[in-house]
Amino acid sequence: MPTRRLLMRQVREILKLRLDVGLSNRIIAKQLGVGETSVRDTLKRLHREGLTWPLPDTISDRELEQRLYGTPGKKAGRRKQSEPDWSAVARELKRKHVTLQVLWEEYIARDPDGFRYSRYCELFRNWHGRLPLVMRQSHAGGEKLFVDYAGDKVAVVDRKTGVVRDAHIFVAVMGASSLSFALATWSEQLPDWIEAHNAAYRFFGGVTQLLVSDNTKCAVIKACHFDPMVNRSYTDMARHYSTAVFPARPRKPRDKAKVENCVGIVERWLLGRLRNRTFYSLADLNKAIADLITRLNDERVIRQYGKTRRALFDELDAPNLKPLPAEPWVHAEWRRCRVGIDYHIELSRHFYSVPYRFARSEVEVRYTIRTVEIFLGGDRIAAHVRGSSNGRHTTVAVHMPPNHQRYREWTPAKIRSEAKRIGPMLRVLVDRIIEKRAHPEQGYRACVGIIGLERRFGVDRLEAAAQRALEFQVLNYPGIKSILEKELDRLPRSERLEQEPIQHSNLRGSEYYH
């Protein structure tokens, strides 16, 4: 089968993780869910086209795709990968501290296009006929931050109502030094999960190369041994901090041994000391947690190293952390929407415009508590300030087709002013039409049309038609136009604006329904 072409947002992410963050092709491939060959191919194409990173701001996704891929040529033949001398590998494994990981790294340094680690191990096991080896856990300074939630919860009592609510304990642990952070949140949902990460990064004062999480639902949409599907909002947060999410493999406890061990320590260190205390707010609980975490990090000595976690952090992790961005990450979520024929998308009962030529298109919407961004094919086509969920419309004038834009000149004040100029009955009619509609904006066009009837029928007849319309509750443009065309405005009419109810045998009284 032909190789599936990468999306341009994936291409940009590959370039960022490789050229900014400095991750290996293998880690980038796992992080983005693409083949390692695709990562290498993307970097080769970038070099071939003479492009530099960061890419120019003026280059769009469409132009980048044309530059990198252009017109497909002949498919290059696949070079046969060189196979190691397995007997030599077996001899080296008998030496102290030598693992398959070490030997594979030496092999891949000699042959960068050689087998990936998993395939390398598989071929060796096939040759030797032995069981899989366990990879030794070793964490370089500033390389990994492990995150998870503790299993046990802490009760928080509402002082006014007495209602008890459970708080969840988020834990983050540095890979090399075991410096620990904990925070109580109301849930393990994505917004709380993201905010806990923001707090953790502020606590550590820097960012690691990798972010290792358990396969919690708010982080990983679909757990997989080889290619987990990471939540897009979580990936966006990692991109903001110039790190990469690296989920632990399912049913592989050694992948998350550091954080699992620390969770146990935190549960014993924190929860045991908090068991007899009553907390009346999340802030009170987090203050108590912060005090105990400070004691754990700064006072308790790790016997095998003879140093505290804080001392190890200052020595191993801190010098290798990347700086924090200027602003913390603002949680954003993604949703697919279809643009309506009125060139608006609906999000939480509020409507946002896009350029009218994109009507009926399927788009992606990225939204925070403050902003709404709309994307089509990776390009942003509209951006708005987040509106309240009240069924209203947020419309940008340039998004409207030309025949709609002229209505933008008619503000509510101008509509009422023009109606008052024609006569008091028309002013009342305009107010009634606007009040009747669920959304006032829906009545503006009808009012503009009614006011425009002055040119055809004159001021006096339009004012008379407005009075008759009010008598018979005709509150729409077609009804007013019909009154004028049929000259009903010339007929004698009651001086009263309200008609007596019609009485006949087909009308049922209120008692009918009781």
From Swiss-Prot:
Which keywords does the record carry? Answer: DNA recombination, DNA-binding, Plasmid, Transposable element, Transposition
The Integrase catalytic domain covers 128-317
Q: Name one GO molecular function term.
A: DNA binding
| Highest taxon listed in the record's lineage | Bacteria
Q: Which residues form the HTH IS408-type domain?
A: 11-93
Q: What Pfam families does its record include?
A: Mu-transpos_C_2 (PF22483)
Alphabetical GO biological process terms? DNA integration; DNA recombination; transposition
Extract the InterPro entries matched here.
HTH_IS408/IS1162_type, Integrase_cat-core, IstA-like_C, RNaseH-like_sf, RNaseH_sf
Checking PANTHER family in the record gives: TRANSPOSASE RV3428C-RELATED (PTHR35004:SF8)
Family per record: Belongs to the transposase IS21/IS408/IS1162 family.
Q: What is this protein called?
A: Putative transposase y4uI
